[in-house]
Amino acid sequence: MKPSHKSCEAAPLLPKMPETSTHNAPLNLSFPSVPSYQIGCSSLPEISRSTERALKEGKLPELVYGVKETVATLSQIPVSIFVTGDSGNGMSSFINALRIIGHEEDASAPTGVVRTTQTRAEYSSSHFPNVVLWDLPGLGATAQTVENYIEEMKFSTCDLFIIVASEQFSSNHVKLAKIIQSMGKRFYVIWTKLDRDLSTSVLSEVRLIQNIQENIRENLQKEGVKEVPIFLVSNLDPLLHDFPELRNTLQTDLSNIRCCEPLKTLYVIYEKIIGDKVANWNQIIANGRLKSSLGVRDDDDMGECLKRYRLIFGIDDESLQQIAHGMGTVVMEYKANIKSQDFHTLRRADWKLRLMTCTTVNALFCLFKFLPCLCHCFKRMRHKRMLLLVAKDTKNILKKILMDAVSPPQI
């Protein structure tokens, strides 16, 4: 078997990619707040245009396939992970355990009681496609400062960091965490030798784990480091303790790092398309062309008009069923995100529409039929409100499609 790693002297990992300033900004799509990058993929513009066309035409089931294709393309983007910490903390052993390979295998990272990692070395894993795991030389073996270490190891080229610790959470670990946080990067703290701690401690397993976690948090909080994921593992047991949770968290964060910014951009485009569509229909309503444009016999029949609006925007029952099928889930996952399933449900959910259609207003509406201008004004208000609510539901469905494409719902 050919080794899947190679040593290098701090060569650049990837072409330097510009970071966005959205790390601390609220995310419209409610993705976890992780650093994200504007990474170019030649096929993405055409895929994006196809989804935009589908949205303009109210064909959301077609949009689903374009979004899934977008996420599949983004998933091929390489991501670099730096594994760092003090010398002797078991960083190389951790990399082998994370990849679920034995130390004796050709592709494994060299391990030993003496310092084995002298230069940066990169590794790959079938469990994390298109991910480069970088095993960095341990910090603290020389008089080198943390700042010089970070510069020499090219921290600015990394997407996600793993700070490895064992026995004690040192000042070097805290400095690393503080600097990485100031860079706006995502990172975890991994305690790697839990098996040894459990075998030597007089405390119960629950109490020992609690003590380790509290100690790490206290040291970080003293230096103003915000809440960070902490995982306690044993390098000897790659399937036990927090390893499964770590791998799941890592998979989620990898998806967010790759997809978050492009999908946020796509959602902004979708919002504009919906806004333009609402403006166009508001003009139709204002011009008194609603009946012919909607294709209804009676534009005072709010229930029938609602069905037409839902069809125009692509969130009618049949479309929702097709969307759910395309996303591999049940239709109720999507119906639960809308209020416009029928007119009575929508009316109950929105007090303004309820007021516009209450008995008193309906009686006035009948009287105003003898005053065409006032009658038209009331009708326009009702339809504009209902149109706005359908547009809002459409945005909710689009948001869910984008989120589910990255993290499919569990059914």
From Swiss-Prot:
Annotated spans, Disordered: 1-21
Binding residue positions for GTP: 86-93, 111-115, 193-195, 234-236
| A Pfam family that the UniProt record links to this protein | IIGP
Entry GO terms, CC: autolysosome; autophagosome; autophagosome membrane; cell projection; cytosol; endoplasmic reticulum membrane; Golgi apparatus; Golgi membrane
Q: What is its main location?
A: Golgi
Cellular location(s): Golgi apparatus membrane; Cell membrane; Cytoplasmic vesicle, Phagosome membrane; Cytoplasmic vesicle, Autophagosome membrane
Please list where the region (Alpha-K amphipathic helix) is annotated. 352-376
Relate the protein's function as given in its record. Answer: Immunity-related GTPase that plays important roles in innate immunity and inflammatory response. Acts as a dynamin-like protein that binds to intracellular membranes and promotes remodeling and trafficking of those membranes. Required for clearance of acute protozoan and bacterial infections by interacting with autophagy and lysosome regulatory proteins, thereby promoting the fusion of phagosomes with lysosomes for efficient degradation of cargo including microbes. Regulates selective autophagy, including xenophagy and mitophagy, both directly and indirectly.
Record's subunit section: Interacts with ULK1; promoting the coassembly of ULK1 and BECN1. Interacts with BECN1; enhancing BECN1-interacting partners and influencing the composition of the BECN1 complex. Interacts with ATG16L1. Interacts with NOD2; promoting Irgm 'Lys-63'-linked polyubiquitination, which is required for interactions with the core autophagy factors. Interacts with STX17; promoting STX17 recruitment to autophagosomes. Interacts with ATG8 proteins (GABARAP, GABARAPL1, GABARAPL2, MAP1LC3A, MAP1LC3B and MAP1LC3C); promoting STX17 recruitment to autophagosomes.
Quote the protein name from its UniProt record: Immunity-related GTPase family M protein
**What are the top taxonomic ranks of the organism?**
Eukaryota, Metazoa, Chordata, Craniata, Vertebrata
